[in-house]
């Protein structure tokens, strides 16, 4: 028997989570949390694979993404709030524990679930981001930077410069991405250049450039050169 991927909504008094699901409702849940800038559909290949292996595979749009609740205040995106969303999602599907899989910005969320709600975990998997006990924040990750690639005098925040830009320019950063959503997606998801391997990442220049797209604060209209 093959299980389809379905669209679902979990509502509480504080939040709405849209999520995709595949598999038997009574099976052990494995919940996939995406990073930035992604959506639940980023897990479109994993959901049917694990759903048809005997798990109940789920992938939510995280807070602020897609069809889940979107908030305008910076503090509404604190890890405490995002973790609360995931615990409510677990309650909504009527289970006590899940296997949590996080990628990129989803990784700090799954680690925080394990730290603060171990009773809601069968296991935790982190892709791309290691476990950092002190928390995934600029103050803890900047000191771990590779200073051969990012000399401190030129790149004080290393590849994490973009995080400081977001923190200090939340409204402007949001406006820049929203000014032309289609162009933003094309710009951020265009294919990388192999010549950039081993060189400072674009994320290290965001404050100096006054944003991802410079002073214009809107994405250029780049062509689509690859489709997935």
Predicted regions and their residues:
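Flexible "cap/lid" subdomain of the alpha/beta-hydrolase fold that forms the substrate-access gate
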Residues: 3-5, 17, 67-97, 101, ...
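Short acidic-hydrophobic surface loop/beta-edge motif
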Residues: 6-12
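Short, well-structured alpha-helical interface segments that form or flank functional binding sites
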Residues: 9, 45, 179
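Active-site donor-binding loop signature of nucleotide-sugar glycosyltransferases
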Residues: 12, 62, 129
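A short loop-to-beta-strand scaffold at the N-terminal edge of the catalytic core in hydrolase folds
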Residues: 12-22
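Conserved HGGG/HGGXW glycine-rich cap/lid loop of the alpha/beta-hydrolase fold
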Residues: 20-70, 89, 103-105, 116
């Amino acid at each position: 028997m093959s299980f389809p991927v379905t669209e679902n909504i979990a509502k509480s008094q504080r939040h709405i989570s849209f999520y995709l699901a595949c598999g038997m409702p009574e099976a052990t849940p494995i919940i996939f949390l995406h990073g930035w800038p992604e959506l639940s559909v980023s897990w479109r290949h994993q959901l049917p694979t694990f759903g048809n292996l005997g798990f109940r595979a789920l992938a939510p749009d995280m807070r602020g993404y897609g069809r889940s609740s979107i908030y305008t205040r910076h503090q509404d995106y604190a890890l405490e709030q995002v973790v609360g969303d995931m615990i409510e999602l677990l309650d909504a599907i009527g289970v006590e524990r899940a296997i949590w899989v996080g990628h990129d910005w989803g990784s700090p969320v799954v680690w925080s679930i394990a730290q603060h709600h171990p009773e809601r975990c069968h296991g935790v998997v982190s892709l791309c981001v290691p476990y950092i006990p002190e928390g995934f924040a600029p103050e803890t990750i900047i000191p771990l930077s590779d200073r051969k690639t990012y000399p401190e005098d030129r790149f004080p925040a290393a590849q994490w410069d973009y995080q400081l830009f977001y923190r200090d320019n939340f409204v402007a950063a949001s406006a820049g991405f929203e000014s032309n959503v289609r162009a933003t997606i094309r710009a951020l998801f265009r294919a990388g250049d192999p010549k950039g391997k081993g060189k400072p990442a674009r994320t290290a220049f965001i404050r100096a450039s006054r944003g991802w797209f410079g002073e214009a604060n809107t994405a250029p209209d780049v062509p689509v050169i690859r489709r997935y």
